[in-house]
C-alpha cells in the first residue's frame, strides 16, 4: 500500500481549522488536525509546500519511520508550526492503520485501560452570581469536574471569561480569538488577580461543597513567587490543579513553586516535544501533562511522553479547547483510553457548524468521554460542508500592564 495524495483544507465553521487528508492507492483515507490558533495559514503552507509531496509513494503503515523522517530530515526541528504539521500526518496515518485493521486506534495502542475518560468543563462569570450560574449549567450538562475562571475587579477583560453572547440558540464556550486584522489589547494587574481569586474559590466551595474537583488556569502570567503565593492561598480549597502558573519557557520556576505549595500543578499546552518535559517530569515538578496531540507531533509522541511520565506517577490532563479540531481531540481520546496513567480531559463542546464539517463517533455521557469504536480515529471530514465556511483571519488577544508594558496573556 502506498500514499498517492495528501490534501490540505482550511475551513472556518465558527473558528478556523486546518485538516490534512491522506489517500492511499487502495482508496483508504486518513485525516489529521494541524490547527494552530491565530497562525493557521502558516501551518497550511508548511504542509502544502514542504510536506505533502514528501508523503507520495510512502507506505502509510510505517508511522514511526515517517514521523522521524519529517522531524529530522528538515534539520530545523521543533516549534509549533513544524510540530502541528507533523501531528496531522501522524494522526492521518494512525487513522488509516485503524481503518485497514478494522479497529479503533485505542485498540492498536494496547486496548482500553478504562471504560470512559473523566472530563472537565469551563465555568466562568463576570461576577460571583454569574459564575455560580455557569457552574450549575455545566453540572446539568453532566460535567463532574469544573474549571473556574472569573473576572477581576478593575480589569476590563480576563482570559477564560466568556464575553460573547450566545447566538442563534446555540451554546458557545469561551472563544478568545478575535476575527480581524489585528489582535485585541487587554489589560492586566497580577496583584488585583492574586487578591481576588482565593475569595472566588472560597465562595464556590461554600456554594457547591467540597466534592467537586475544581481547576484553575493561570495562563503563564505569574512570576515564581506570585505563583507560589497563589498556590499556597488556594490550598484550603483543595484544587484538582493550578495550571500554567508561570511562563512555559522558565521551567526552573516550577521548582520554587513546588517548594512552597501542595496545590497540584499542570503545564504544557504550548510545549511541542517530549524534550520540553524531560526535566520537569524527572524532577516531579508537575502532576499533570497538558500537552495536546495537535501541537505535540500527534498520537505517537503523546503516547511516548505519557509512558515516560508514568514512571513518576504523573498523569495526563490533555489540552482540549475548541481550537483543537474534533480530529485532534479524538486522537488524544484514543491515547487517554489506552494509557494507564490517565488523569482528566479538558472538554469544550464544538459548535453545530463544526459538527457539520466533522462527523464524530465520540460520546460524552455522565461526565465521561469515549472515542467510539469506529475503525481509525472515528472522525469523518465533509469536504463539501467545509467549503461553505472559508477561512477568516483571527488573532488571540495580548495583555498590557497599567504602565503599557506588554505582558503574558
UniProtKB/Swiss-Prot annotation:
The keyword Metal-binding applies. D-arabinonate binds at residues 219, 269, 290, 319, 346. Disulfide bonds: none annotated. Pfam families: MR_MLE_C, MR_MLE_N. Keywords: Magnesium, Metal-binding. The keyword Metal-binding applies. One of its GO terms (biological process) is carbohydrate catabolic process. Transmembrane segments: none annotated. GO terms for molecular function: magnesium ion binding; mannonate dehydratase activity. Belongs to the mandelate racemase/muconate lactonizing enzyme family. GalD subfamily. Has no detectable activity with D-mannonate and with a panel of 70 other acid sugars (in vitro), in spite of the conservation of the residues that are expected to be important for catalytic activity and cofactor binding. May have evolved a divergent function. This is D-galactonate dehydratase family member Achl_0790. It comes from Pseudarthrobacter chlorophenolicus (strain ATCC 700700 / DSM 12829 / CIP 107037 / JCM 12360 / KCTC 9906 / NCIMB 13794 / A6) (Arthrobacter chlorophenolicus).
